[in-house]
Amino acid sequence: MNQWLAWQISGLGPSQGQLVWFLAFHEGAHGEKPGPSIIARYQNEVERLRSVLETHLASAPGGYVALGHLTIADLAILPWLKLSALAGPALKPFDQYPAVDAYIKKLDALPEVQAAYKKAVPPPQ
């Protein structure tokens, strides 16, 4: 479980956060568009990380990242997967990652996750 929590906090979160920053906010904050190599760097890394997750989930017991059941690692990963919508077409749609897509749908359907969504401001799409 700790491995997947570390994967999110050191990989997916920072890489996707940087991608979204450069796509959505950099120009407004700095008055210039980011170079294409910057976008490509983070785009490629996020897609690589999604592939790692896809490979793992395809054979993970119970369809969760660790221990065969819901853990804090799943709850740390899910918001970043959901927030990838902010990157728009810069990232492949989740239907190209069927195990990740099923994982998102599975977690979204959990009563605990639904309860958290009701408290979110604004609610996630």
Segment roles from a protein language model:
Residues 4, 8-106:
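GST-like fold's C-terminal all-alpha helical module
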Residues 113-125:
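C-terminal helix/juxtamembrane-tail motif
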Residues 1:
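Hydrophobic, well-structured mid-protein blocks that either form specific transmembrane helices
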